[in-house]
């Protein structure tokens, strides 16, 4: 029997990156600069807080924190 591993919900402290395909199709993409930095799609960013369906993400760079919809974020898995 092969059971699927349940997906962990994102929470405060989770390491994430932005899913480019989902973000590009969102209403937020229409309201933002089309030339976004590559690091948001590469990760990792850390979730600082969650309010309803949005997460505040801090990148490991000297840039401001950013709010993204939770469905646009994916868990960052470090390469071994």
UniProtKB/Swiss-Prot annotation:
Pfam families: NdhO. The keyword Thylakoid applies. The keyword NADP applies. It is a peripheral membrane protein. Its main location: membrane. It is found in: Cellular thylakoid membrane. InterPro entries: NdhO. It is an enzyme of class 7 (translocase). Its EC number is 7.1.1.-. It catalyses: a plastoquinone + NADH + (n+1) H(+)(in) = a plastoquinol + NAD(+) + n H(+)(out); a plastoquinone + NADPH + (n+1) H(+)(in) = a plastoquinol + NADP(+) + n H(+)(out). Keywords: Membrane, NAD, NADP, Plastoquinone, Quinone, Thylakoid, Translocase, Transport. One of its GO terms (cellular component) is plasma membrane-derived thylakoid membrane. Disulfide bonds: none annotated. GO terms for molecular function: oxidoreductase activity, acting on NAD(P)H, quinone or similar compound as acceptor; quinone binding. Belongs to the complex I NdhO subunit family. NDH-1 can be composed of about 15 different subunits; different subcomplexes with different compositions have been identified which probably have different functions. NDH-1 shuttles electrons from an unknown electron donor, via FMN and iron-sulfur (Fe-S) centers, to quinones in the respiratory and/or the photosynthetic chain. The immediate electron acceptor for the enzyme in this species is believed to be plastoquinone. Couples the redox reaction to proton translocation, and thus conserves the redox energy in a proton gradient. Cyanobacterial NDH-1 also plays a role in inorganic carbon-concentration. This is NAD(P)H-quinone oxidoreductase subunit O. The gene is ndhO.
């Amino acid at each position: 029997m092969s059971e699927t591993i349940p997906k962990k919900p994102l929470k405060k402290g989770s390491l994430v990156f932005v899913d480019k395909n989902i973000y590009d199709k969102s209403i937020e993409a229409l309201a933002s600069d089309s030339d976004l930095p590559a690091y948001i799609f590469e990760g990792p960013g850390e979730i600082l807080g969650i309010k309803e369906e949005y997460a505040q993400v801090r990148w490991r760079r000297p840039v401001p924190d950013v709010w993204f919809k939770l469905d646009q974020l994916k868990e960052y898995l470090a390469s071994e």
